Amino acid sequence: MSFLKLFKQFVVTGFNKKLLFLSETTCWSYEIQPDLPLEKCRPKKYFDADSDSDEESTQQPQKPPTNGNGTADNVQIVALEVHEGKSLLAVATSDKSLFLFAIDPEGDETNKDRLKLLSRRMVSRTSSCMKFAASGKFLVVCDKGGDCYRYDCDDDDCKKPGRWLLGHMSQVLDVLVPDNERFIITSDRDEKIRVTNHPDCHSIETFCLGHGEFVSQLEFVTAKDGKSRLLSLSGDKTLRLWDYETGKEVARKELSHPGNRFAVKQLLDGTLLVAVLFYEPTEMAIYKLTEVESLTSETIQTLKTNQNEVFSSFAFDERNNLLSLVVDKVTEKISLKWYQFEQENCKFNDLTPNPLEKLFFDNTENDKISYVDSVSFLFKKKFDNLKDYQERKRRRIVEGGKYNYGGRM
């Protein structure tokens, strides 16, 4: 797995155990150490989430978790988020750890002061997604079991255990927190988008229902009336717009293939640029949405990878350029692509070579990353039980015919 985020003038990438901060002139790296100190408190489950007692305070300090085979050698980054306002970086790893760092890009050249570890806390299961609240006061972490936890990020609370917020019956694939922090919005493998009140998460505000397959990603967009809407992407080949406070579907756009991930950039005139990565991650379609409320759009470009390569993580920068990590499935090499936005013709040009690409290559030349198909298993499994029943019935009739009239044939 690999991740790409933007933080001020830096492009932040994460894969294996490695973090890279890149600008056009500099690059510095950090490697997650599995033996870093671990807070002794476990996350509070649903049955004690409302309790203020620190029932874990008497426990012995926890041993660093492992990857399941007794070692921490193969620990990998499974989720990554940044908060620009508070200069925070959150990293979840495969050993069920949540690292919270303070970022100081002006630190010394040894990188020791550029990333300061604030805490390493435990999560109940392997994380599937996470998001910072707009204020940066807390982080919502969701796991593959369907549970969502709140982890405080303020200086005084950043070492406290996670507190259970809500749960789904299936894997949570994405989570959002609006600016007013009134809701926690989650999507899951079972086609549902759930809008839960916050902090009273026992109360569900509404569901946004209509997708026929897993809902892989969510994003807020702003309509012309200034109201916030919810954009969702699904494996049912649709992109949908919702009034998430009422659960009403506002508009939908049919896609040519099941959706995997997307990136959204809203221009000053209200136009949306939406880059959609399909189920087969060798193609990325870029749409220009001129009317947000109706999802009126045109396909302005389709980007394709070279042979054996697949798009991984991608994002728009502040200049509307598109940045993407690309993985070669054969050589297991990872590279960074930079597509420059040409506003006059509304298209993206592949800038190869470019300073970012070279810096990334120089700092990852000896790294390898295995490509993992994380989408196929999300589709609903279909079983044709009727056909099996009819076949068994036919066999019984054929076999029963041998003993008609009480005699042998």
Curated annotation (Swiss-Prot):
Q: Where is the segment annotated Disordered?
A: 48-72
User: Its principal location?
Assistant: nucleus
Q: Which top-level group of life is the source organism from?
A: Eukaryota
Keywords for the protein's UniProt record, in alphabetical order: Nucleus, Repeat, tRNA processing, WD repeat
Tell me how this protein assembles: Forms a heterodimer with the catalytic subunit.
- List the protein's name: tRNA (guanine-N(7)-)-methyltransferase non-catalytic subunit wuho
Q: Per its UniProt record, what PROSITE patterns does this chain match?
A: WD_REPEATS_2 (PS50082), WD_REPEATS_REGION (PS50294)
Query: Which SMART domains does this entry report, sorted A to Z?
Result: WD40
Query: Which residue ranges contain the repeat WD?
Result: 72-111, 122-161, 167-206, 210-252
- Where is this protein localized, as stated in its record? Nucleus
Compositional bias (Polar residues): 58-72
**Organism of this sequence:** Aedes aegypti
Function summary? Required for the formation of N(7)-methylguanine at position 46 (m7G46) in tRNA. In the complex, it is required to stabilize and induce conformational changes of the catalytic subunit.
Q: So, what pathway does this thing act in?
A: tRNA modification; N(7)-methylguanine-tRNA biosynthesis
Q: Quote a single Gene Ontology cellular component term.
A: cytosol
Gene3D superfamilies listed in its UniProt record: YVTN repeat-like/Quinoprotein amine dehydrogenase
Q: Which GO terms describe its biological process?
A: tRNA (guanine-N7)-methylation
Protein family: Belongs to the WD repeat TRM82 family.
